[in-house]
Curated annotation (Swiss-Prot):
Keywords: Cell inner membrane, Cell membrane, GTP-binding, Hydrolase, Membrane, Nucleotide-binding, Protein biosynthesis. The keyword Cell membrane applies. Required for accurate and efficient protein synthesis under certain stress conditions. May act as a fidelity factor of the translation reaction, by catalyzing a one-codon backward translocation of tRNAs on improperly translocated ribosomes. Back-translocation proceeds from a post-translocation (POST) complex to a pre-translocation (PRE) complex, thus giving elongation factor G a second chance to translocate the tRNAs correctly. Binds to ribosomes in a GTP-dependent manner. Its EC number is 3.6.5.n1. PROSITE patterns: G_TR_1, G_TR_2. This is Elongation factor 4. GO terms for molecular function: GTP binding; GTPase activity; guanosine tetraphosphate binding; ribosome binding; translation elongation factor activity. Its main location: membrane. It comes from Brucella anthropi (strain ATCC 49188 / DSM 6882 / CCUG 24695 / JCM 21032 / LMG 3331 / NBRC 15819 / NCTC 12168 / Alc 37). One of its GO terms (biological process) is positive regulation of translation. It is found in: Cell inner membrane. PANTHER family: TRANSLATION FACTOR GUF1 HOMOLOG, CHLOROPLASTIC, TRANSLATION FACTOR GUF1-RELATED.
């Protein structure tokens, strides 16, 4: 049943967002008859509603295509569609490790973008053969020759043989299939008779079948009825089904060397299936594990709280379900005096945060408040120990801290020349250090080192608005560096509000504090007593706004008469207000939290 190795091609498609990866995948499926016309829809592989609406791919998907080449031979092509967005670079790295070749899709009207570079370099690091595909050549603005030259200059791959296609209209799709067969290599030698060795590429949860595991067989044969063992976790399972995606699930009897397929094995927890783990047969194990991947580290943390405290258990259950599908999302319980019970969650980046929040709200009908996103700081304590700080509210006493280190990123920004000045100004405002500036035709490529803390809030939105949407941005974490950071607390009526505390750079503290106090002044309703709103760093107040009191006209009932009568009533009111101020609680509406946290860095 297994296909001979030299007739298998495992490949992935890498490209910048919106350059047409998923549409090309649709055409390849259509042309090879993976789905009939009735089942075809746009972006077949984007299975989540959010993926379709935003037009982005989040989870990597796989398809097995059968193709009869022009030389009369039958080939099996395994395609892995990868996400293009920087937050999901982890999904990309894992998909690339399961393949031997890549199609590099570049939009013929836009040329090379920042994420094109990041993903191509990952493919080259995995020793991939690369076939260049120029998409959207039917557009009037397409300039294939200029883009070819740009690919050669920027990436350094020979683009003379590039395949010209239009994934939307279907021009040139057959040429792509031929190029895959002729230019991409077959899987490296695999031995059918050796002990089973397979790489776990991905896993997700299905409510009927339990956990479905995507595997790439390297040696040996995987079939129904075997007992497999995960070498990393040591867990053992009997295999119930083996199969492939065409993109429908189709069961097969066995998976041989070089093939990509799925297995189900009554696994209840996705946590038991570590991505990059080696799967082997329990009876006859292989002695050497695969090198695997490094697990995804959360980069951005924020608190998620239900607007209605009664939804807490529902939120816990919903997060557990999302965790089954997304191993890079982590959470733990936390309580806040202002917001009640909730969770501290870790994400790969801001888009990841937004998507998880949106999925919780849509798929589970929850109303949520998110606190300001923060990054992981390292605290070097006076006693020589090192701590990680995920939540600014938990910061220990400043006296005990020797130094605070913050994560920095290496960012690559590609932009048309016209917006270069404004973008450099933005990077400098965010404490960026310029590393490099090169020109590729009319576009500039700038490399900056930036503190992640400054990027987390709204850097991406600002970049897009400054450049009218033309600039593209990609980053990877570089290292931790010492920074002059201080904890800013917000006091409302002289009570600290833990959900609004944040770590900021000393130079920006006053500006941020003032802006936040002004915002809260607009959002908190007036009470019967005066409310001060203060931003404090340690014991020093750096900004203050006051919400004036509402007052009842107590003297309205006095018609004329002695002035002492009026004075007595006013004094009595003053006493009451004083007492009220001492014991009164200021109610901060939920809306105020949401707005204040959205403020970011305006």
């Amino acid at each position: 049943m297994s296909t001979p190795l030299d007739h298998i091609r495992n490949f992935s498609i890498v490209a910048h967002i919106d350059h047409g990866k998923s549409t090309l995948a649709d055409r390849l499926i259509q042309l090879t008859g993976g789905l009939d016309t009735r089942e075809m829809k746009d972006q077949v592989l984007d299975s989540m509603d959010i993926e379709r609406e935003r037009g982005i791919t989040i989870k990597a998907q796989t398809v097995r295509l059968s193709y009869k080449a022009k030389n009369g031979e039958d080939y099996v092509l395994n395609l892995i569609d990868t996400p293009g967005h920087v937050d999901f670079a982890y999904e990309v790295s894992r998909s690339l490790a399961a393949c031997e070749g890549s199609l590099l899709v570049v939009d013929a009207s836009q040329g090379v973008e920042a994420q094109t570079l990041a993903n191509v370099y990952q493919a080259i690091d995995n020793n991939h053969e690369i076939v260049v595909v120029l998409n959207k050549i039917d557009l009037p603005a397409a300039e294939p020759e200029r883009v070819k030259q740009q690919i050669e200059e920027v990436i350094g791959i020979d683009a003379a043989q590039a395949v010209h296609i239009s994934a939307k209209t279907g021009i040139g799709i057959e040429d792509v299939l031929e190029a895959i067969v002729t230019q991409l290599p077959a899987p490296k030698e695999g031995d059918r008779n050796a002990p089973l060795k397979a790489m776990l590429v991905d896993s997700w949860y299905d409510s009927y079948l339990g956990v479905i595991v995507l595997v790439r067989i390297i040696d040996g044969v995987l079939k129904k009825g075997q007992t497999i063992r995960m070498m990393g976790t040591g867990a053992k399972y009997p295999v119930e089904r083996t199969g492939v995606f065409t993109p429908k699930m189709v069961q097969v009897d066995e998976l041989g060397p070089g093939e990509l397929g799925f297995i189900t094995a009554s696994i209840k927890e996705v946590a038991d299936t570590r991505v990059g783990d080696t799967i082997t047969e329990d009876r006859r194990p292989t002695n050497k594990m695969l090198s695997g991947f490094k697990p995804a580290q959360p980069v951005v943390f924020c608190g998620l709280f239900p607007v209605d405290a009664a939804d807490f258990e529902d939120l816990r259950a919903a997060m557990g379900k999302l965790r089954l599908n997304d191993a890079s999302f982590s959470f733990e319980m936390e309580t806040s005096a202002a917001l009640g019970f909730g969770f501290r969650c870790g994400f790969l980046g801001l888009l990841h945060l937004e998507i998880i929040q949106e999925r919780l709200e849509r798929e589970f009908n929850l109303d949520l408040i998110t606190t300001a996103p923060s990054v992981v700081y390292r605290l070097n304590m006076q006693d020589g120990s090192q701590k990680e700080l995920h939540n600014p509210a938990d910061m220990p006493d400043v006296v005990k801290i020797n130094a605070i280190e913050e994560p920095w990123i290496r960012a690559t920004i590609m932009t048309p020349d016209d917006y270069l000045g404004a973008i450099m100004k933005l990077c400098q405002e965010r404490r960026g250090l310029q590393i490099d500036l090169t020109y590729v035709g009319p576009r500039a490529m700038i490399t900056y080192d930036l503190p992640l803390n400054e990027v987390v809030f709204d850097f991406y939105d600002r970049l897009k608005s400054i450049s009218k949407g033309y600039a593209s941005f990609d980053y990877n974490l570089s290292d931790y560096r010492e920074g002059d950071l201080v904890k800013m607390s917000i006091l409302v009526n002289e009570e600290p509000v833990d959900a609004l505390s944040m770590l900021v750079h000393r130079s920006a503290a006053e500006k941020r504090g003032r802006a936040l106090c002004e915002k809260l002044k607009e959002l908190i309703p007036q009470h019967m007593f005066k409310i001060p709103i203060q931003a404090a760093i340690g014991g020093r107040i750096v900004a203050r706004e006051t919400i004036s009191a509402l007052r009842k006209d107590v003297t309205a009932k006095c018609y004329g008469g002695d002035v002492t009568r009026k004075r007595k009533l006013l004094e009595k009111q003053k006493e009451g207000k004083k007492r009220m101020r001492q014991f009164g609680k200021v109610e901060i509406p939920q809306e105020a939290f949401i707005q204040a946290l959205k403020m970011g860095d305006d």
